[in-house]
A protein has these predicted regions:
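Sec-dependent bacterial lipoprotein signal peptides
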Residues: 1-18
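Aromatic- and Gly/Pro-enriched helix-to-coil junctions and flexible linker segments
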Residues: 19-152
């Protein structure tokens, strides 16, 4: 074996040995972050997801952006009647039960939410930082709704 062949074989063997994976174990789970559902139904959904929809110019009349699953892959929402609320809590739990459109919207929005709202896609994308259009500016009052939800 020539020196060049030996060197190539050694480098290849070292490279192969350095490529390893870490086995997370049998009980690995991704932490499930829970955000206040009542706050979502009574504040976030009506003030952000419904009112802001596509922002100035209403870019899509085809069920308004996120309410059209064909147009959005990240946070597809389902239209439904506004959840009845009083004192910050839904008054009719049947409107938000398992399998309901409202519950699906909560799950979709929670996936793009973070305790540090300034890193959450639900804040970044509509403020134009990671989205093809600006839906609302960073100074919009609805940002406070997102911030408050992150704390709940």
């Amino acid at each position: 074996m020539t020196f060049a062949a030996w060197l190539a074989a050694t480098v290849l063997a070292l490279a192969a040995a350095s490529c390893t994976t870490v086995e997370p174990g049998p009980n690995f789970v991704v932490p499930d972050e829970q955000f206040d559902a009542d706050f979502f139904f009574c504040r976030v959904e009506p003030e952000l997801l419904i009112v802001k929809r596509c922002g100035p110019g209403e870019g899509s009349d085809n069920n308004n952006c996120h309410f059209n699953s064909a147009a959005v892959s990240g946070m597809a929402l389902a239209p439904h009647p506004t959840v009845d609320c009083a004192d910050g809590h839904p008054t009719n739990r049947a409107q938000i039960g398992a399998g309901s459109a409202a519950q699906g919207n909560l799950q979709a929005a929670s996936l793009v939410m973070s305790r540090d709202y300034t890193t959450a896609p639900i804040y970044l994308r509509p403020t134009g930082q990671n989205h093809p259009r600006t839906i609302f500016p960073k100074e919009d009052p609805v940002v406070d709704v997102i911030r408050l939800w992150a704390q709940k």
